[in-house]
Swiss-Prot record:
NCBIfam families: PRK14424.1. Belongs to the acylphosphatase family. Gene3D superfamilies: 3.30.70.100. Keywords: Hydrolase. Residues 12-98 form the Acylphosphatase-like domain. This is Acylphosphatase. It catalyses: an acyl phosphate + H2O = a carboxylate + phosphate + H(+). The active site is at residues 27, 45. Pfam families: Acylphosphatase. It comes from Burkholderia lata (strain ATCC 17760 / DSM 23089 / LMG 22485 / NCIMB 9086 / R18194 / 383). Its EC number is 3.6.1.7. InterPro entries: Acylphosphatase (IPR020456), Acylphosphatase-like_dom (IPR001792), Acylphosphatase-like_dom_sf (IPR036046), Acylphosphatase_CS (IPR017968). One of its GO terms (molecular function) is acylphosphatase activity.
Length: 98
């Protein structure tokens, strides 16, 4: 790990995605994108038809993930993405689907 990576501040964001985001491979595609961006955390379906995620990484990584979540995989129809930074000491080991 480089010195820059060690110095980089780790941020954690809680995200909700609304629209046609269940039954379209959204969680699976989110895991793939998170792995490509070297993010950690999780993604899950909620009973109200939305998808929630906790994403953890550098600010630049999170910005790229939020941009991707605004459209998601091809079959998804995202209408809204909301997010807020969360303060936590917890460090996720990987990004996974719940």
């Amino acid at each position: 790990m480089s010195r820059n990576e060690l110095d980089e501040r780790i941020e954690t964001y809680y995200v909700r995605v609304r629209g046609v985001v269940q039954g379209v491979g959204f969680r699976h595609a989110t895991v793939r994108e998170a792995h490509a961006l070297k993010l950690r955390g999780w993604v899950a379906n909620l009973e109200d038809g939305t998808v929630e995620a906790m994403i953890q990484g550098s600010g630049a990584q999170i910005d790229r993930m939020l941009a991707w979540l605004r459209h998601g995989p091809p079959a998804a129809r995202v209408t809204e993405v909301t997010f807020e930074e969360r303060q936590t000491e917890r460090r996720f080991e990987r990004f996974q689907q719940q």
